[in-house]
Amino acid sequence: MTQTWPFLHNAQSFIQENWNASGFQKPTPVQEQAAQLIMDGKDVIAESPTGTGKTLAYALPVLERIKPEQKHPQAVILAPSRELVMQIFQVIQDWKAGSELRAASLIGGANVKKQVEKLKKHPHIIVGTPGRVFELIKAKKLKMHEVKTIVLDETDQLVLPEHRETMKQIIKTTLRDRQLLCFSATLKKETEDVLRELAQEPEVLKVQRSKAEAGKVKHQYLICDQRDKVKLLQKLSRLEGMQALVFVRDIGNLSVYAEKLAYHHVELGVLHSEAKKMERAKIIATFEDGEFPLLLATDIAARGLDIENLPYVIHADIPDEDGYVHRSGRTGRAGKEGNVLSLVTKLEESKLKKMAKKLGVELSEAVYAGGKLKTK
């Protein structure tokens, strides 16, 4: 494959070796399309579904462009949550193996003094949450004048009011000729408008999941009364091989579902945005080990969550279009098989069908009978 993907063919040996060791056969469409644009120094705004390899799409060219002999930060990657920052940081750590490049993670809630010590080791790449990165810039601990590239991961979240001004301030601390790379699973028009103001003549990439990949994720819905959704979740939890990330609308609903399911002796984990970092990590690790079938979460709590080979996503409460894309993208990642189940009332059925049609999702009705899930 190194011969047919120009970027990889021309990349430094450590990138080629790590690629060969990864077992990847070929780049995903977003990786292939973004690499050359980034190498050419262009600003990029990219939309590509969750699970299509967006992190590597920018990480590999960013690693390729770093000059190890220069001792200052050359790339800053911003992400909206601590979990996502740590995931991206791990990707950078894995793919810089065999090189002299150094990276540091800067997240809120962690010890500032330790982070300042990290910066004294002259990392080439910074991965961080906007609040903590800006705090260290203001404290003159993080120097931005030599930063050549800024990456905004999950851009749709970074332009929300709670992050937008901080993100803009961080970008303003760099020189005008810096490169801006924006990657997101969904790209609303207002998000794109904000980014166009910040970027310089950006190339806009909109990559769809291939038909073959999309076909590996089965989208189904089950009809029940609102009051029976807990009972249905209880039944689904007993399906063979059931391991599902169950999305609910808000923290109030989360508590209601969790209490009722626990009352019926359903083993589950609960992720809410107020959970402590260690507590979250423990719940996620236990779920990944298959200790319980259902992990309940709100959209905010699940930000940056990446569970490998997750077989099911369940929408206990119906989201909007962007929410459906983000949530459903947690299963069937990197071309693997997956299942998306929506629990809907008769009234919600038409809303779901309209949404599926707009998103180009093939949807079928299913029923739970005889301990199995059957297509109606």
Swiss-Prot record:
Statement: the UniProt record of this protein carries the keyword Nucleotidyltransferase: no
InterPro entries recorded: DEAD/DEAH_box_helicase_dom (IPR011545), DEAD_box_RNA_helicases (IPR050547), Helicase_ATP-bd (IPR014001), Helicase_C-like (IPR001650), P-loop_NTPase (IPR027417)
PROSITE patterns cross-referenced by the UniProt entry: HELICASE_ATP_BIND_1, HELICASE_CTER
Domain Helicase C-terminal: start-end pairs: 231-374
Mutant phenotype after disruption: No visible effect at 37 degrees Celsius, decreased growth at 16 degrees Celsius. A quadruple disruption of all RNA helicases (cshA, cshB, deaD, yfmL) is not lethal at 37 degrees Celsius, although both 50S and 70S ribosomes are decreased, while growth stops at 16 degrees.
One Pfam family, short name: DEAD
Example GO biological process: response to cold
Keywords from the UniProt entry: ATP-binding, Helicase, Hydrolase, Nucleotide-binding, Ribosome biogenesis, RNA-binding
Locus of motif DEAD box: 153-156
Binding of ATP, residues: S48, P49, T50, G51, T52, G53, K54, T55
Catalyzed reaction equations: ATP + H2O = ADP + phosphate + H(+)
MF terms (GO), sorted A to Z: ATP binding; ATP hydrolysis activity; RNA helicase activity; RNA strand annealing activity
Enzyme nomenclature, EC number: 3.6.4.13
Signal sequence coordinates: none
Expression induction: In rich medium highest expression in exponential growth, expression decreases in stationary phase (at protein level).
Functional summary from the UniProt entry: A probable DEAD-box RNA helicase that plays a role in ribosomal 50S subunit assembly. May be a non-specific RNA helicase.
Protein family (similarity comment): Belongs to the DEAD box helicase family.
Name of the protein in question: Probable ATP-dependent RNA helicase YfmL
Species this protein is from: Bacillus subtilis (strain 168)
